[in-house]
């Protein structure tokens, strides 16, 4: 039996579209999500929050939550 995360795939798609829509450059935001996912994977290797959540999904959720802070999406 496979365990399913309690996250809805449509919700993840909505969050990623929201994140991409707010970004001025789709490539840069994609790279930033990938870097955040890589950091999450190395830092939270044995995380007890939700071990079934993939690092990329966690990064998308975190970054879409941080949309209120423009420095996350601005081109530095």
From Swiss-Prot:
GO BP terms = DNA-templated transcription
GO molecular function (one): DNA binding
Task: Could you list this entry's UniProt keywords, alphabetically sorted.
Answer: DNA-directed RNA polymerase, Nucleotidyltransferase, Transcription, Transferase
**Protein origin, superkingdom:** Bacteria
Is tRNA processing among the key words of this record?
no
Q: Is the keyword Transmembrane helix assigned to this protein? A: no
- Return the GO cellular component terms, semicolon-separated: DNA-directed RNA polymerase complex
Question: Which reaction does this enzyme catalyse, per its entry?
Answer: RNA(n) + a ribonucleoside 5'-triphosphate = RNA(n+1) + diphosphate
Q: Name the InterPro entries for this protein.
A: DNA-dir_RNA_pol_omega, Pol_omega/Rpo6/RPB6, RPB6/omega-like_sf
This entry's Enzyme Commission designation comes to: 2.7.7.6
Q: How does it assemble?
A: In cyanobacteria the RNAP catalytic core is composed of 2 alpha, 1 beta, 1 beta', 1 gamma and 1 omega subunit. When a sigma factor is associated with the core the holoenzyme is formed, which can initiate transcription.
Q: Which family does it belong to?
A: Belongs to the RNA polymerase subunit omega family.
Q: What this chain does, per the record? A: Promotes RNA polymerase assembly. Latches the N- and C-terminal regions of the beta' subunit thereby facilitating its interaction with the beta and alpha subunits.
Name assigned to this protein:
DNA-directed RNA polymerase subunit omega
From which source organism is this entry?
Synechocystis sp. (strain ATCC 27184 / PCC 6803 / Kazusa)
The lineage is:
Bacteria, Bacillati, Cyanobacteriota, Cyanophyceae, Synechococcales
């Amino acid at each position: 039996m496979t365990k399913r995360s309690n996250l809805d795939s449509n919700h993840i798609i909505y969050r990623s579209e929201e994140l991409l829509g707010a970004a001025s450059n789709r490539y840069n935001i994609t790279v930033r999500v990938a870097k955040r996912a890589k950091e999450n994977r190395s830092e939270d290797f044995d995380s007890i929050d939700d071990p079934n959540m993939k690092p990329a999904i966690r990064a998308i959720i975190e970054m879409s939550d941080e949309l209120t802070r423009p420095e996350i999406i601005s081109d530095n």
